[in-house]
């Protein structure tokens, strides 16, 4: 039986951990150096609810310089991973301010999984100290859940690509969301 194909697009601020999340899931290795993404594609196979799914993973650039290029990734998307970094409250603020309006414009009705990346840094003493200098603190789980509810996300999950904690759950949930979407999307327009 052929695998079901689904397209996943990942969005979020620059340096919030999008590429690491995709690489750890698809290649099971954590990249040592940060290189800003312009546009990358990966493919990974996952089994969810007894179904074999081939996930096309579309990485995007979060930097504002790419705001006009990024929409080229959106056509035929089945699920969106919308990411922020737990060590960057500003990146969470940009979820309802920037990312949700953009995604809802180009991908109306596509399920969104809100993902808090870099969960390991929530309790990292150096991260906590650095944020305290700016009168900030790491994002709390309830803050993430509140934003997920506000934007109508399918789910809210947290993970750490560095420790591999929660990675599989993110992609299982995203695949479930993409598979559920299929049932609703059957009616296509016909011109006679």
Swiss-Prot record:
Summary of activators and inhibitors of this protein: GTP hydrolysis is stimulated by unc-89.
Any Gene Ontology biological process: actin filament organization
UniProt-annotated location(s): Cell membrane; Cytoplasm; Cytoplasm, Cytoskeleton; Cytoplasm, Cell cortex
Keyword terms: Cell cycle, Cell division, Cell membrane, Cytoplasm, Cytoskeleton, Developmental protein, GTP-binding, Lipoprotein, Membrane, Methylation, Mitosis, Nucleotide-binding, Prenylation
Residues anchoring lipid (S-geranylgeranyl cysteine): 189
Domain of life: Eukaryota
GO cellular component assignments: cell cortex; cleavage furrow; cytoskeleton; cytosol; plasma membrane
Annotated GTP binding sites: 12-19, 59-63, 117-120
Gene Ontology molecular functions: GTP binding; GTPase activating protein binding; GTPase activity; protein kinase binding
Nucleotide-binding among keywords: yes
Membrane topology according to the record: Lipid-anchor
Modified residues (Cysteine methyl ester): 189
Consequence of gene loss (knockout): RNAi-mediated knockdown predominantly results in embryonic arrest with surviving embryos developing elongation-defective uncoordinated kinky larvae. Defective ventral migration of P cells leading to defective gonad development. Defective establishment of anterior-posterior cell polarity in one-cell embryos. Abolished cortical contractility in early embryos.
Span(s) of short sequence motif Effector region: 34-42
Residues of the propeptide: 190-192
Tissue: In larvae and adults, enriched at the tip of the head where the anterior sensory organ is located and in the pharyngeal nerve ring (at protein level). In embryos, enriched at the boundaries of dorsal cells undergoing intercalation, ventral enclosure and elongation.
One Pfam family from the record: Ras
Physiological role: Required for ventral migration of epidermal cells during ventral enclosure in the embryo and for cell elongation. Also required for ventral migration of P cells during larval development. Involved in asymmetric spindle positioning during anaphase and establishment of cell polarity during embryo development. In adults, involved in regulation of multiple processes including locomotion, pharyngeal pumping, fecundity, ovulation, defecation and body morphology. In body wall muscles, regulates organization of myosin thick filaments downstream of unc-89.
Binding partners and assembly: May interact with unc-89 (via DN and PH domains). Interacts with bli-3 and memo-1.
Similarity comment: Belongs to the small GTPase superfamily. Rho family.
Protein name from the UniProt record: Ras-like GTP-binding protein rhoA
Naturally occurring in which organism (per UniProt): Caenorhabditis elegans
UniProt lineage: Eukaryota, Metazoa, Ecdysozoa, Nematoda, Chromadorea
Gene designation per UniProt: rho-1
